[in-house]
């Protein structure tokens, strides 16, 4: 059974023949083309067309055999068809070789068929018979027109080969772990069927028939797995991927190169080392061009040696290009895919979905250019080596007869509509010929060479141009290409770095921390996040038991002086950090420290009660506290020691337990902490026992327990009420909307910024610590309750403001009005900065740097430079480099001033602190090895989370002393609703300025450019020609050139 030409099975070309009628149309077209070339007296074109027609007839014959069309009518027609084609070919060759060109021209130009040569009439008659037989064959096979044909032209199976000689992670299988075999299922079935093996299930196929795994494919990782790379094609690559493949060079680097400035510096440093040698080689070639008398074989060998030395120095650059960490772009593709492979319950709303798809479609062109550059880099290096080898040969084209005269893809099928007289000749000559005049440098040819050149022309029409006689010229051109491609590599690495930063910056400014986390999933270095200057380095999984501070030693000494029955039992299981805080410990040790009455640690108490749910379940936590309340006395105590233990330890611990419980239920209780097993603890009974024992605070504890668990209904500790102004905003009273350019420009920027600040600060004050924890923990520890309503409202308001700003600009058709709007919004952003409203300021500049606005060249030209400089300074303040270092320094200088901070920084800090640090510490005792990985809680991670939460709460304490304008607040709130998302705005942007050429950058010195930088230059108009010019093809065989006119 033949293997059918299925798009699901092979990497097919657009012009591949799949159905019978496709082949029939293609054959008929070549028949017409052959006849036309014959009558046009174009011998070269005719031979090309006849050759291609013969190949198609051969395919027809093969198809009849593979499809087992064995009827007698088919056989007879095929035999006659092949016989007629042979006669036509012989007679046509006799016609072209037995008659002079002028005679053929005169005969072919005769319109009266009877006045033509008998030989030509015989040839045309034979061809008419061929026409008839072909139509007859088509008629006989008409019932099989829609039959899928067997695959005749060589094609690669899908998912079994990368189709390239360098590393491209985007061509890897996405779900390798779900594959039952190393080779694709459909490929196994197809090959098994062709081999005569019938198996409905792949597992039924014998193991010996399955083949071996393709190392070039199976070694590839899923987007979140560690990279395992082979150094592919420093020059050569083994593409077969079979088990008996030859040895290849494996990269010694185990980790990929990150997309950052350090990697770019490595490439630049390597290029700088190569530039000096390369310039010297170009200089030597120029000297030889200027004076051929200096030619010597020794000089050629020296240049050859320098070439190999240069290429050896290029290997690190190729290694970097092959091992760049593109995980963020892989994750972007997976997130934009409907069948995404992330195991987590990823909640992506419509706005995020649109943002991801827009980013993916925009970045795809840049990534495509990057891979084209990689291929061009490999091509240039290969050509550089071959040209250098030519220098050592007496005749540099001595191996030319070994090469195929036909270019690659000569017999590839083409669309019939694209086949004409001109491109048929181009197909013969190859599509790689470029303008010779652009490639040649001017130099005076040697007179003797010219004489020999003309003699060769008279003897053979297939000749070389003047470069045949001057290899130094070819070598110099190769050096120039090599020099240029090194610069091109640096340019593309830098562009990928910027695109990565822009993608993360936009996500951060839009406060999409969940998207940021998923984009960075699996990236090398993900998790080692530094939340700021004061934060400690990320925790490692290994700590040492003797990492105590001096203060801790003194406190421990005081504990040692106490009687054994008054000492804490689990002190040895506490780990102290350098900042005199608890870094980690066992659950028992942490609870013991929490309930100790001698050394109160308020920060520890707050941190524990806020983050306890990441350590215990609610029932487990309260059970530990009840156990502490009911401490058992140590053994072998006398009466006096027992009384001392009760007085100095038991009663203080009981008071401390009641105090912790009361504080927990009163200030830190959250509805999501409720669990079915809580009822088994009988908390009301526990509180009543404490009252009977006259424990301080027990009455208040019972009151809190009854309030929280009254009538079986769990109630939250606090029920924040929304302010009147927010209720007004949410009711959407009918009022004036800022829906026109005139209405927006009519509002004073100071008034607009003031009311924005009032509105956003009120929403900010509604954010609770539980909102923040729910945002980063999701449903990891607690049930979803409310889904962070306060925080979601704040983020939604900022994103709506961004969409409103950008939409207000792109919907305006008049360029001058758009320029006024841009200036107006820049002034509003500046006043927001003066009011310390960094949230609104960031939302506005994010809109102005978004792709629909950033690409408006003519509009930005109409904005005065001073205003653009103002936007530049605002954007520089929110530069995400070094983790928003400029913004963080500005925030620290505010002290007690009112402020609406940019929440995206807090979300990033919370997300990366939680995801980038382990939940548990591994305790190592010197050389004794590792013990119990999950025994010691990483409490330092929880402390850092609380540090961030405290800063969030700090800015809720100080309020603005501004006068509210309810009309403006109402209009702002209502105007932010029902705004089109970024994709729709981008289409409007293309309408108002459809063909941008050169982008006017409002912030030319900042790296925080829109992630759509130069994207408009990559639209469909002119994209193909740009790529073709940027990555020119070259040929390693003889250069063809149109011959000078020679008298016939």
Swiss-Prot record:
Gene3D superfamilies: Ras guanine-nucleotide exchange factors catalytic domain, Son of sevenless (SoS) protein Chain: S domain 1. Residues 748-995 form the Ras-GEF domain. Keywords: Cell cycle, Cell division, Guanine-nucleotide releasing factor. Pfam families: RasGEF, RasGEF_N. Residues 1010-1032 have a biased composition (Basic and acidic residues). One of its GO terms (molecular function) is guanyl-nucleotide exchange factor activity. The keyword 4Fe-4S does not apply. Residues 212-224 have a biased composition (Low complexity). InterPro entries: Ras-like_GEF, Ras-like_Gua-exchang_fac_N, Ras_G-nucl-exch_fac_CS, Ras_GEF_dom_sf, RASGEF_cat_dom, RASGEF_cat_dom_sf. The keyword Cell division applies. Residues 1035-1048 have a biased composition (Basic residues). It comes from the Eukaryota. Residues 578-710 form the N-terminal Ras-GEF domain. Residues 208-242, 419-444, 997-1048 are annotated as: Disordered. GO terms for biological process: cell division; small GTPase-mediated signal transduction. Promotes the exchange of Ras-bound GDP by GTP. This is Putative truncated guanine nucleotide exchange factor SDC25. It comes from Saccharomyces cerevisiae (strain ATCC 204508 / S288c).
């Amino acid at each position: 059974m033949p293997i059918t030409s299925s798009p699901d099975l092979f990497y097919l070309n657009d012009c591949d023949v799949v159905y019978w009628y496709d082949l029939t149309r293609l054959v008929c077209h070549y028949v017409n083309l052959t006849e036309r070339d014959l009558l046009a007296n174009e011998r070269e074109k005719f031979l090309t067309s006849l050759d291609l027609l013969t190949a198609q007839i051969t395919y027809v014959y093969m198809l009849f055999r593979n499809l087992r069309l064995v009827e007698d009518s088919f056989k007879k027609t095929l035999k006659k068809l092949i016989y007629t084609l042979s006669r036509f070919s012989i007679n046509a060759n006799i016609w072209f070789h037995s008659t002079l060109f002028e005679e053929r021209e005169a005969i072919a130009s005769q319109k009266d068929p009877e006045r033509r040569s008998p030989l030509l009439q015989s040839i045309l008659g034979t061809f008419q018979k061929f026409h008839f037989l072909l139509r007859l064959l088509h008629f006989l096979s008409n019932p099989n027109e829609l039959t899928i044909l067997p695959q005749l032209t060589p094609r690669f199976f899908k998912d079994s080969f990368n189709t390239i000689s360098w590393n491209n992670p985007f061509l890897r299988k996405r779900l390798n772990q779900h594959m039952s075999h190393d080779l694709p299922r459909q490929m196994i079935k197809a090959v098994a069927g062709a081999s005569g093996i019938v198996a409905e299930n792949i597992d039924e196929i014998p193991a010996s028939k399955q083949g071996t795994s393709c190392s070039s494919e199976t070694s590839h990782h899923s987007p979140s797995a560690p990279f395992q790379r082979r150094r592919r094609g420093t020059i050569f690559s083994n593409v077969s991927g079979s088990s008996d493949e030859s040895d290849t060079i494996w990269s010694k680097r185990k980790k990929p190169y990150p997309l950052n400035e350090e990697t770019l510096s490595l490439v630049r440093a390597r290029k700088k080392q190569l530039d000096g040698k390369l310039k010297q080689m170009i200089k030597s070639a120029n000297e030889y061009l200027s004076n051929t008398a200096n030619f010597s074989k020794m000089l050629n060998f020296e240049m050859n040696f320098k070439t190999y030395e240069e290429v050896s120095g290029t290997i690190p650059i190729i290694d970097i290009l092959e091992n760049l960490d593109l995980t963020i772009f892989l994750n972007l593709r997976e997130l934009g895919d409907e069948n995404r492979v992330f195991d987590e319950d990823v909640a992506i709303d419509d706005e995020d979905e649109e943002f991801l798809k827009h980013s993916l479609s925009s970045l795809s062109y840049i990534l495509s250019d990057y891979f084209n550059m990689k291929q061009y880099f490999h091509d240039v290096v290969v050509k550089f080596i071959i040209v250098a080898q030519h220098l050592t040969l007496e005749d540099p084209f001595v191996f030319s007869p070994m090469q195929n005269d036909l270019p690659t893809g000569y017999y590839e099928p083409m669309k019939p509509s694209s086949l004409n007289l001109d491109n048929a000749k181009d197909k013969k000559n190859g599509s790689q010929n470029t303008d010779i005049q652009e490639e040649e440098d001017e130099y005076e040819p040697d007179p003797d060479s010219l004489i020999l050149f003309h003699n060769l022309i008279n003897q053979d029409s297939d000749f070389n141009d003047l470069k045949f006689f001057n290899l130094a010229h070819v070598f110099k051109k190769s050096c120039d290409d090599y020099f240029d491609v090194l610069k091109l590599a640096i340019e593309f690495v830098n562009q990928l770095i910027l695109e990565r930063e822009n993608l993360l910056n936009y996500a951060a400014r839009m406060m999409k921390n969940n998207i940021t986390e998923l984009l960075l999933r699996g990236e090398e270095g993900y998790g080692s996040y530094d939340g700021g200057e004061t934060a400690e380095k990320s925790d490692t999984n290994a700590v040492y038991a003797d990492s105590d501070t001096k203060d801790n030693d003194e406190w421990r000494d005081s504990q040692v002086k106490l009687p054994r029955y008054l000492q804490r039992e689990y002190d040895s299981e506490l780990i102290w950090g350098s900042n005199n805080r608890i870094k980690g410990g066992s659950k028992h040790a942490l609870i013991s420290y929490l309930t100790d009455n001698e050394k109160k640690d308020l920060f520890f108490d707050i941190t524990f009660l806020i983050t306890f749910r990441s350590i215990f379940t609610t029932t487990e936590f309260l059970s530990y506290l009840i156990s502490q309340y009911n401490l058992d006395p140590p053994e072998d105590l006398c009466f006096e020691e027992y009384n001392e233990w009760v007085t100095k330890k038991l009663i203080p611990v009981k008071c401390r337990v009641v105090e912790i419980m009361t504080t927990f239920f009163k200030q830190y209780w959250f509805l999501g902490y409720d669990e079915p097993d809580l009822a088994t603890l009988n908390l009301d009974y526990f509180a009543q026992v404490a009252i009977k024992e006259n424990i301080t605070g027990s009455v208040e504890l019972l009151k809190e327990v009854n309030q929280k668990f009254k009538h079986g209904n769990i109630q939250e500790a606090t029920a924040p009420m929304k302010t009147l102004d927010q209720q007004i905003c949410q009711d959407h009273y009918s009022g004036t909307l800022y829906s026109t350019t005139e209405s927006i420009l009519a509002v004073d920027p100071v008034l607009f910024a003031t009311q924005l600040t009032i509105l956003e600060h009120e929403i900010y004050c509604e954010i609770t610590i539980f909102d923040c924890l729910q945002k980063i923990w999701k449903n990891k520890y607690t049930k979803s309750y409310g889904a962070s309503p306060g925080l979601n409202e704040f983020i939604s308001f900022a994103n709506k403001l961004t969409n409103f700003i950008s939409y207000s600009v792109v919907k305006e058709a008049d360029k001058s009005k758009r320029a006024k709007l841009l200036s107006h919004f820049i002034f509003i952003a500046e006043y927001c900065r003066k009011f310390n409203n960094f949230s609104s300021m960031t939302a506005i500049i994010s809109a102005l740097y978004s792709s629909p606005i950033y690409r408006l060249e003519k509009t930005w030209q109409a904005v005065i430079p001073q205003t653009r400089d103002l936007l530049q300074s605002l954007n520089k303040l929110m530069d995400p480099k070094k983790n928003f270092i400029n913004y963080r320094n500005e925030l620290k200088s505010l002290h007690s001033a009112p402020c609406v901070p940019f929440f995206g920084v807090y979300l990033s800090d919370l997300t990366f602190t939680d995801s980038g640090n382990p939940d548990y510490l591994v305790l190592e005792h010197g050389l004794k090895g590792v013990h119990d990985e999950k025994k010691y809680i990483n409490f330092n991670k929880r402390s850092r989370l609380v540090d961030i939460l405290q800063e969030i709460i700090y800015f809720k304490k100080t309020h603005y002393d501004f006068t509210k304008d309810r009309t403006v607040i109402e209009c702002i709130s209502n105007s932010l609703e029902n705004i089109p998302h970024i994709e729709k705005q981008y289409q409007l942007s293309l309408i108002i300025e459809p063909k941008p050429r050169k982008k006017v950058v409002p912030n030319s010195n900042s790296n925080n450019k829109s992630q759509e930088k130069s994207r408009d230059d990559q639209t469909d108009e002119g994209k193909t020609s740009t790529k073709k010019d940027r990555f020119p093809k070259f040929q390693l065989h003889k250069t063809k050139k149109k011959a000078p006119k020679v008298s016939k």
